[in-house]
């Protein structure tokens, strides 16, 4: 195997969207084109050729392991594609954010009837912060939706990113006729036996169809006043190519996939703590753990550490360094994923995602290196929690299991832990309600420690430098606490309480995480 050639083939990306925008459907269609499934909704076992319903798709019903980001891999057109799926709204957690740290590009799926929605905006901010390319798929053209020009305007006004349409819809809903493909300079037809037609045939095909006339006017306007196409701007995350289509009817998806694979970047390097970038083509293996997934099925008490390979090649049985602990580990039981099936893997290269069976060795953010290399990658960002719960052990006799459970689950990144400065009470912070449910379930199931959880509601969180701290600054409207690293932090009741504090203590600098 020529390692350099293999790395060049890799395309690793995440799909982000608001719930119900069609992310699951487009994921299924991409897997269908990759030959992994026979039809959307059925996943093919690689070895047996049997077919199974892809239960990982039904995110809302399954509050178990499948709500966490799945990793799927397939080959298409000479490329090895790694898709990282990110859970939707109800199942939103820091997992989703961290997944975006392990990809080289993002595909943003937007419901063309609704435009940019809250969750899309949140996820886009994380992607923008990383400076990676974003490709936009305006979905559901088989239904009536908003005007295409309005949708482009929203990308610029709400997300602050310039856009360039790769194709343009001819009508929508019941009047949907197809796409005017600006990139390939052809027509993609929604109805009839022919899939494509030349632009010259447009007038003959559509006659005086008012929607086609509108398309020609829109394109003239875009040519005069729209953004210029620039591959450089796409790769810098400054320009998003926009594709229109319908994932449900599998229209426009294959064209999107082919153009996406042409412009999506090959694996990126990753920054070390000293600021130096590790090149993906370095021969020495390195990677980082971006999530740990513990199975919620009590029959399989396994934990899997998801590792993004940054450089070199993984080979089964290899020994690695874990610089955080100064110890080593052997990577013998390693998997790659296809929906709910796991395949043992013997080798993988930079850009790939592997799952390492974990007996408690790894933490989220850990760096893996080989040989004399003992460097660490930059830490993964900490995300500011939005909702809080007080937590205590239900049974005083179970304090030991309670503390062990909390320590391990916090290390794993399941929730964030805070301690009330004055009372020593434990408080948990999360970005989504599901994190608390998973925490409670696992404390009881895995650590035999029942917990009492009391909602504290939403809080606005700000860190304060220890030298600026005076305990008298605390009040009922801004609780003073310590995070798990013993750094002081205020939990403000709301934005008004934060502004009041800032006015009262103008010289005190408060810090916000992502």
Curated annotation (Swiss-Prot):
Annotated tr-type G domain residues: 8-268
InterPro entries: EF-G-like_DII (IPR053905), EFG_III/V (IPR035647), G_TR_CS (IPR031157), P-loop_NTPase (IPR027417), PrfC (IPR004548), RF3_C (IPR032090), RF3_dom_3_sf (IPR038467), RF3_GTP-bd (IPR041732)
Gene Ontology terms for molecular function: GTP binding; GTPase activity; translation release factor activity, codon nonspecific; translation release factor activity, codon specific
Residues the entry annotates as binding GTP: 17-24, 85-89, 139-142
One record GO biological process: regulation of translational termination
Superkingdom of the source species: Bacteria
Pfam families attached to this UniProt entry: EF-G_D2, GTP_EFTU, RF3_C
A Gene Ontology cellular-component term: cytosol
Disulfide bridge partners, by residue number: none
Subcellular location: Cytoplasm
Biological role: Increases the formation of ribosomal termination complexes and stimulates activities of RF-1 and RF-2. It binds guanine nucleotides and has strong preference for UGA stop codons. It may interact directly with the ribosome. The stimulation of RF-1 and RF-2 is significantly reduced by GTP and GDP, but not by GMP.
PANTHER family: PEPTIDE CHAIN RELEASE FACTOR RF3 (PTHR43556:SF2)
HAMAP family: Rel_fac_3 (MF_00072)
The protein's name in its UniProt record: Peptide chain release factor 3
Origin species: Streptococcus pneumoniae (strain 70585)
